């Protein structure tokens, strides 16, 4: 029996090499990404013989949702099973509620962020992250990355044209899977598809300096987020073993070379861990480290998970840390940890066992 190929792996020009004429590729993209077709037989504007040809050669269901949990704050965590039985988690984060005026008319739409996984597991070994506990199983294909987003939008009846933000902050190190992640960015941005601008897609990394430079040279227009979490190499190596390969100086050099839109900033994620990296002296060092860089610091209070020895700091301490940065001219926010009650917050995702 012929093995079917995932059509979500293909850019339009790649499909155009297999399917003629090109306007049919445009129609196929629109059926999949805009009309949310369930199968090729739904694509009524295509000739019957083309629909049959597509069904004989392609599929577009590389991920299957086997479980979902909804948080009190409205966040939804999805457990997806892949074709080989491995599993990843993704999260839909409601960022802004729909607004209705006194006359019952909608004056603004709800806004969402989708946190997507790029690998099954992760090899970075960060001591505070649950994903790292199981190690790396494999990279996700481009279609498996795109499939998470497509399924979530379809399941929640989010029209294709409705703006969503994509953050590659789920399971895995995105830059360890740069080829497939960068292609996913391009596919998601297609005007005949989901039309998610690269400026609405943020790629997070633990600090792979070489790949940061490679990503910059691609000129995709994506936003960059650096998981920093410490201001000196000794502490960062303790928290993040990847620092042995790429120390803070190497990361900052790569960041300085990264092309950023004049209106945008590089995001630095800083996980505050009680008694470890949350002192005001750390905040002062962070100010020095970011000198001369268009940066925004995103403070995250540590999210507890099974087996962790770290503690979550008080909000009071986090605000003091934030105030010091802000008073020194560093743009800084404290991230609200959405989905904490369903283990969907930062550092809490993992490959859940099949018995679940």
UniProtKB/Swiss-Prot annotation:
Residues holding S-adenosyl-L-methionine: 172-173, 204, 227-229, 303
Catalytic activity, reaction form: adenosine(2503) in 23S rRNA + 2 reduced [2Fe-2S]-[ferredoxin] + 2 S-adenosyl-L-methionine = 2-methyladenosine(2503) in 23S rRNA + 5'-deoxyadenosine + L-methionine + 2 oxidized [2Fe-2S]-[ferredoxin] + S-adenosyl-L-homocysteine; adenosine(37) in tRNA + 2 reduced [2Fe-2S]-[ferredoxin] + 2 S-adenosyl-L-methionine = 2-methyladenosine(37) in tRNA + 5'-deoxyadenosine + L-methionine + 2 oxidized [2Fe-2S]-[ferredoxin] + S-adenosyl-L-homocysteine
Note: Reaction proceeds by a ping-pong mechanism involving intermediate methylation of a conserved cysteine residue.
Chief location category: cytoplasm
The keyword Disulfide bond appears for this protein: yes
One Pfam family in the UniProt entry: RlmN_N
HAMAP family: RNA_methyltr_RlmN
Function in brief: Specifically methylates position 2 of adenine 2503 in 23S rRNA and position 2 of adenine 37 in tRNAs. m2A2503 modification seems to play a crucial role in the proofreading step occurring at the peptidyl transferase center and thus would serve to optimize ribosomal fidelity.
Entry's Gene Ontology molecular function annotations: 4 iron, 4 sulfur cluster binding; metal ion binding; rRNA (adenine(2503)-C2-)-methyltransferase activity; rRNA binding; tRNA (adenine(37)-C2)-methyltransferase activity; tRNA binding
GO biological process annotation, one example: rRNA base methylation
Domain Radical SAM core stretches: 108-341
Record GO cellular component, one term: cytoplasm
EC number per UniProt: 2.1.1.192
Protein name, entry field: Dual-specificity RNA methyltransferase RlmN
Protein keywords: 4Fe-4S, Cytoplasm, Disulfide bond, Iron, Iron-sulfur, Metal-binding, Methyltransferase, rRNA processing, S-adenosyl-L-methionine, Transferase, tRNA processing
Record's cofactor remark: Binds 1 [4Fe-4S] cluster. The cluster is coordinated with 3 cysteines and an exchangeable S-adenosyl-L-methionine.
Gene: rlmN
The species this protein was found in: Campylobacter jejuni subsp. jejuni serotype O:23/36 (strain 81-176)
Cystines in this chain: 115-346
Binding, [4Fe-4S] cluster: 122, 126, 129
